[in-house]
């Protein structure tokens, strides 16, 4: 069995990728024992010939660590493979730009994090590299990659019907697409969580409704102003008691966490840094305030949390706002005072609206998406066999990125 991978002029780069990933027996160690290949170069092509069919199947996930959502989805797929298939699959998650590209692409993570913290700068960069302004092929290929679908893929997993329709318009066949939802950490999908128990575990007030305020992994957005507005609005001055409690997730923003911890609060407040068990914090709360990151939205929907979107990154996150609002699962406002007013109403005079939005959120939720994806990949692998029938148009395009 052989697979034509790339023209000879690319073979050194491709060898480097496979060697550093450690999957295909180019290096030493246990992976070489599981599966070895002879490398044969002939008439401008490089072929990998498998020796021995019995081996652990390998999955290579290529991603870019520009924003927490990409890595989170990749790691969710990796974890789902482990839960579903154990040692049958070995999964490698690689940042293709950082690990295998040259400058400036290998510096994208640092540049991206700087620009999204300065939203207007990111907005200018995003739209100035749009194909409608730039005709250079290579710039368009990078800048507009988020909106393109490769017609040579075996399968394209779409988070929604709207995305699937766009894929069909861009040349994919219906048989190539599957609408399973966004892959979310298995802990969100299969955990059986009881709100009262979680509040005891997390040392929260068991009687007061709770709002979760998030700023993403980097602690972005108007977190401080919103927190202070909530601290005032969720305190009933007439009765001199709180009507709600506040959980603030500051991510990796240690300065923000330190500032918020130093403030005096009239209501119960917990300030937390980067968290790895968000399913518990979401499960213990009644609504969430966050920017329009797709991963956080998908997680909130699974937990049935009404969502207040208070910001979005121009370009890739803008379309997430109408998805939440138009489906009745939340609202959008950039005003900290308006945000605090909405939460106070949900916790007092508009509890029916809060309940209705929670029900709508659960209707949109797709908790089994990550398991549906890995099961479908497994079925494809079983049908096609290892390294069989992979279209050259796909492999050649991958090689061009290296």
Task: Give the location of each predicted region.
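C-terminal amphipathic helix plus adjacent low-complexity
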Residues: 5, 12, 16, 347-402
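Donor-nucleotide binding loops and adjacent catalytic segments primarily
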Residues: 191-285, 318
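Conserved N-terminal ligand/cofactor-binding loop architecture of enzyme catalytic domains
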Residues: 76-138
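Active-site-proximal region of nucleotide-activated glycan assembly enzymes
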Residues: 141-193
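Acidic donor-binding loop of glycosyltransferase active sites
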Residues: 283-293
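N-terminal subdomain of nucleotide-sugar transferases
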Residues: 2-98
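Short hydrophobic beta-strand element within catalytic cores of glycosyltransferases
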Residues: 288-290, 306-315
């Amino acid at each position: 069995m052989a697979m034509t991978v790339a023209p000879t002029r690319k073979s050194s780069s491709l060898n480097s990728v496979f060697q550093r990933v450690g999957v295909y027996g180019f290096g030493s160690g246990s992976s070489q024992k599981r599966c070895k290949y002879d490398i044969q170069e002939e008439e401008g092509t490089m072929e990998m010939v498998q020796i021995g069919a019995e081996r652990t199947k390998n999955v290579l996930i290529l991603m870019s660590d520009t924003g927490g959502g990409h890595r989170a989805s990749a790691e969710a797929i990796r974890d789902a493979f482990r839960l579903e298939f154990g040692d049958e699959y070995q999964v490698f998650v690689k940042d293709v730009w950082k690990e295998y590209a040259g400058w400036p692409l290998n510096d994208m993570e640092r540049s991206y994090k700087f620009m999204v913290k300065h939203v207007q700068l990111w907005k200018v960069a995003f739209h100035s590299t749009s194909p409608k302004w730039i005709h250079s092929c290579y710039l368009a290929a990078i800048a507009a990659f988020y909106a393109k679908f490769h017609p040579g893929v075996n399968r394209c997993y779409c988070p929604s019907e709207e995305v699937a329709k766009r894929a069909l318009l861009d040349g994919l066949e219906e048989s190539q697409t599957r609408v399973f939802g966004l892959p979310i950490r298995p802990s969100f999908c299969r955990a059986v969580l009881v709100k009262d128990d979680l509040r005891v575990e997390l040392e929260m007030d068991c009687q007061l409704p709770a709002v979760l305020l998030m700023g993403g992994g980097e602690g972005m957005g108007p977190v401080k102003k919103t927190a202070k507005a909530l601290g005032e609005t969720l305190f009933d001055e007439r009765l001199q008691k709180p009507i709600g409690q506040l959980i603030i997730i500051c991510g990796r923003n240690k300065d923000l966490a330190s500032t918020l911890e130093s403030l005096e609060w009239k209501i119960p407040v917990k300030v937390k840094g980067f968290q790895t068990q968000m399913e518990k914090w979401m499960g213990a709360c009644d609504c969430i305030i966050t920017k329009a990151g797709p991963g956080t939205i998908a997680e909130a929907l699974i937990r049935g949390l009404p969502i207040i979107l208070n910001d979005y990154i121009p370009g890739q996150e803008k379309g997430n706002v109408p998805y939440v609002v138009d489906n009745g699962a939340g609202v959008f406002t950039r005003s900290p005072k308006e945000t605090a007013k909405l939460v106070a109403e949900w916790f007092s005079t508009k509890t029916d609206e809060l309940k209705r939005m929670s029900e709508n959120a659960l209707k949109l939720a797709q908790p089994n998406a990550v398991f549906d994806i890995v099961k479908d990949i497994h079925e494809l692998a079983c049908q096609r066999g290892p390294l069989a029938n992979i279209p050259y148009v796909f492999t050649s395009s991958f090689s061009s990125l290296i």
